[in-house]
Amino acid sequence: MQKQHQRQHKVELVANLKSQFADAKALLICDYKGLSVRKLEALRNKARNQGIKVQVIKNTLAHIAMKETGYSDLDLKETNVFLWGDDQIALSKLVFDFQKEHKDHFVLKAGLFDKESVSVAHVEAVSKLPSKEELMGMLLSVWTAPARYFVTGLDNLRKAKEEN
């Protein structure tokens, strides 16, 4: 009875992971060997505030969930923590900022963006991009610049005519 309950729990966990992995735009796998529980909880709290999920998953269960989701086959060995979410930039920034603070105990091992394997260097490059909100602000600034310059020009023309 106990083993049957454990098996059912594992099946439910894999189904849940499969669903969440399928919906995620980004998935990063990190080695957390030697990281204290307190520090891992701090990472979870930062991630939760950004809508990012963090979970330590048994490699065999993660492998099954990833395979059934269609993610490329990854070599899952040793201790792994999985981080996933919809914002690739926010997830990359979170991982690399945390990795800077905990160099010896937290290392990015693999990454998947839109179900495609990406290198650690690619994830690092993405982490250096402006956030989604900053990019939208830049774009809005570019869009409104012509109107701003036009209004400024009209105002300068009005002031010049008033002086004459």
From Swiss-Prot:
UniProt entry tagged with the keyword Plastid: no
User: From the UniProt record, which GO molecular function terms apply?
Assistant: large ribosomal subunit rRNA binding; structural constituent of ribosome
Kindly give the CDD domains that the UniProt entry links to this protein.
Ribosomal_L10
Q: What does this protein do?
A: Forms part of the ribosomal stalk, playing a central role in the interaction of the ribosome with GTP-bound translation factors.
Which family, according to the similarity comment? Belongs to the universal ribosomal protein uL10 family.
Keywords assigned by UniProt, alphabetized:
Ribonucleoprotein, Ribosomal protein, RNA-binding, rRNA-binding
How the protein assembles, per its UniProt entry?
Part of the ribosomal stalk of the 50S ribosomal subunit. The N-terminus interacts with L11 and the large rRNA to form the base of the stalk. The C-terminus forms an elongated spine to which L12 dimers bind in a sequential fashion forming a multimeric L10(L12)X complex.
In Gene Ontology terms, what is a biological process of this protein? translation
**Keyword presence, Ribonucleoprotein:** yes
Q: Which InterPro entries match?
A: Ribosomal_uL10, Ribosomal_uL10-like_sf, Ribosomal_uL10_bac, Ribosomal_uL10_bac_type, Ribosomal_uL10_CS_bac
Protein name per Swiss-Prot or TrEMBL? Large ribosomal subunit protein uL10
One GO cellular component term of this record is: large ribosomal subunit
